[in-house]
Amino acid sequence: MRKILVGLVLTVVVSFYVFPISFTFLPHAINSKILVGVFGIVAFILNGIREKGIYFSEPTIVGAVMASLFSVWCLYSITGTSNYNTIYADYIVSYATWLAGAYGVYAALGLVYEKVDLEIITRYLALVGVFQCVTAVLIDNYGGVQSFVDRWMDLDQDFLHRGNRMYGIGAALDPGGIRFATILVMIAHQFSTNLNVRNNSLYQTSDLVAFATITIIGSVISRTTTIGAALGIAYIIIALFRMRRGGFVTLRMVRRFFWFILVMIGIVIAAVYFYRSSETFKEYVRFGFEAFFNWVETGEFRTDSTDVLMERMWKWPSDLHTWVFGQGTFGIYENNTDIGYCNFTLYCGLVGMVMFSIFFLYCHLVQNRKYKEFQITSWLLIALTFIVWVKVTTDIFFIDALLFCAVGDYEEATESTDSLLPKMMQLYNTKQNR
């Protein structure tokens, strides 16, 4: 029982970071991510006192420099205009807040686990995803649960209720869907590369069930979730075929492929059963996978929201100065568009958008130097980042911040021989918690 309670508390802490919420009894600006970040700062200082020194890893410093340069450029873009929208002019503050929150998650998990590595992080991300999905179903079906959540948590419920949208505790609309998509990519990575999962049918089943749950319910919350599902499934299939040795199919590959197919068939059978027997579940699935049902029934792979996006929201600058420097306007109310590429160009110009893109390329790719077999995952995270910008401006730096803090896979000897690594900077974080 104690382990279950501890696991539940840690899941809530991670959820507060990944899916930030504001509380009705606190100022709106003080959300759960900031509270976790405050804990992270305190834990970081205490750890510095214990270690007799405060150290920042190379990626966090390089990332901070890049975020600062982007912020300065955005500040320059809004200077001299009548628009004083500082949403990205202070991105360095957002960067620091996410990083502090990530260290808070790392420190909280470190109170229980001797080594907070990628497996632990991914395991709790999966738990958080399932927790949010289950909570969303409870909120949507039980008035008492919805009343409790709406009373204590400020989630912009009026807008969600008007649109008849499902929501969890902080998981809603495209920002929630993008985080679900990221979690699905991380689950696919763990299922495909982690030895503990490879050698344990229970772990394989739990990962696949979590993947399916987040895909189905997460897509009802936000159809953006399906992007992560598609990337994750592609990764799992690629990984299964990469297990061949010398061009031959191995017994281990056959066993894993069989188990994967068996579990997926079970999930599909369960989904079909509930689709036919439950009108509520049927409505969920038809909304979450509207494009698929339109394709089956009409031959057109489309959704109503995508039609609006493509027909009305491609707004581009009308002069060279705005193309290069931007005009400091941002969002649906100022630019009449939600599309990320359009908003970035109108806000800070192509120069700013390129700077921001390079920042994420670095944050995703640098993880290859810290985690083994992470190359495909890095490129999937890059793909996810740039695909979702077709729809919204939300980014996924939260996962990079967590990966910066988690314990790496490589040996400390690798760290000491890294020619790019200054003497007092740690890249790999191979030390276990004490």
Where are these regions (language model features)?
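A membrane-periplasm/extracellular boundary helix in multi-pass inner-membrane enzymes
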Residues: 140, 219, 237-293, 315-319
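A conserved mid-to-late transmembrane alpha helix and its immediate loop/hinge
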Residues: 167, 218, 329-367
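Hydrophobic transmembrane alpha-helices and their immediate junctions
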Residues: 242, 347-386, 414-415
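TM-adjacent membrane-interface loops and short helices in multi-pass inner/ER membrane proteins
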Residues: 283, 287, 294-336, 350-352
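Transmembrane alpha-helices of multi-pass inner-membrane enzymes
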Residues: 185-188, 376-386, 392-434
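N-terminal signal-anchor transmembrane segment
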Residues: 1-51, 72-79, 382, 398-400
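Aromatic-anchored transmembrane helix interface
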Residues: 62-69, 84-110, 120-125, 129
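Alpha-helical transmembrane segments of multi-pass inner-membrane proteins
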Residues: 122-147, 171-221, 226-239
